[in-house]
């Protein structure tokens, strides 16, 4: 039973209708030819895998910022948070996590706190690994106010394939660290804007696990630009 659980993960409810559609199309393909039917089976399994929602063990130690997404760190650089959040117009350290179509796309809160703002903005669909995706692509931004009064911003960004951002929370909601707050369908990116003076503890190219990998400690010092760069994928 444990071995089965290793390979078969729970599926997020957002994926049920997509798997149902893939399964229905697969049935039709089998009526045409078994070869197409088996291709449909493979695509249906992939769709189920894409919407998997495994449990995660979030570190309990206070003062940690946790990755909101599975994927790879593609950018670390200073940037001003999205204007629609109403945060101060001050550059903060932005850590970007790029998710391929093979990553789990359920998004988790990097810190615990109150959601003070949720702002959706339509946009383009450039490759999410590019720097300009933060400014130009469709996005949904959240501001989270922590217990100490500091704010952290996390931004869901649609990518070249992803065309649908889903957010489960509204302003006033209380989030626990590692709690699910949304997902992005079929490839995308998450940006985390660390509070002023907080340094990231990750590097470009590092693999991230949502709800588990530590991005930063809230007590760390000022960030330098030595890690600034870009990863193309």
UniProtKB/Swiss-Prot annotation:
Pathway field: Phospholipid metabolism; phosphatidylethanolamine biosynthesis; phosphatidylethanolamine from CDP-diacylglycerol: step 2/2
Cofactor note: Binds 1 pyruvoyl group covalently per subunit.
Keywords: Cell membrane, Decarboxylase, Lipid biosynthesis, Lipid metabolism, Lyase, Membrane, Phospholipid biosynthesis, Phospholipid metabolism, Plasmid, Pyruvate, Zymogen
Cofactor: pyruvate
Gene Ontology CC annotations of this record: plasma membrane
Subcellular location, record wording: Cell membrane
Stated family: Belongs to the phosphatidylserine decarboxylase family. PSD-A subfamily.
Official protein name in the record: Phosphatidylserine decarboxylase proenzyme
Organism: Ruegeria sp. (strain TM1040) (Silicibacter sp.)
Source species taxonomy: Bacteria, Pseudomonadati, Pseudomonadota, Alphaproteobacteria, Rhodobacterales
The encoding gene: psd
